[in-house]
């Protein structure tokens, strides 16, 4: 069930995402708007956000490209668009199981233009 739509922007682009109705998605929306410094790990962008959450039922480590994830251990939003350094197949493999919040609405490969240190801005659409 759709809970909210957010906009994720960085210096060279922006994408929309649809969030499902989960406890972590609600906590993320309550923290918006926010900015953070991007880090990259293979074909994944992640950044720390001021959200605390517990691992939810249904948390996953291997997800489809374009999944919006929350890495509980690092209090970070994780946005994979392809293989990570620990991927075994074509799908992204996250560093550990993460809460699944929703899905990027556009072309997740656009995140390839994000560089470590870029400012990421998240807001409600």
Name the predicted role of every residue range.
Residues 14, 20-27, 31-125:
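Glycine-rich active-site loops that engage anionic ligands at enzyme catalytic sites
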């Amino acid at each position: 069930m759709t809970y909210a739509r957010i906009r994720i922007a960085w210096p060279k682009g922006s994408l929309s995402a649809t969030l499902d109705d989960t406890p972590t998605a609600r906590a993320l929306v309550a923290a918006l708007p926010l900015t953070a410094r991007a880090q990259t790990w293979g074909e994944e962008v992640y950044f720390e956000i001021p959200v605390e959450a517990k691992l939810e039922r249904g948390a996953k480590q291997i997800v489809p490209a374009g999944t919006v994830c929350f890495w509980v251990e690092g209090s970070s939003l994780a946005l994979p668009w392809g293989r990570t350094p620990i991927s075994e197949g074509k799908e992204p493999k996250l560093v550990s199981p993460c809460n699944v919040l929703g899905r990027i609405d556009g072309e997740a490969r656009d995140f390839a233009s994000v560089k470590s240190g870029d400012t990421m801005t998240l807001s409600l659409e």
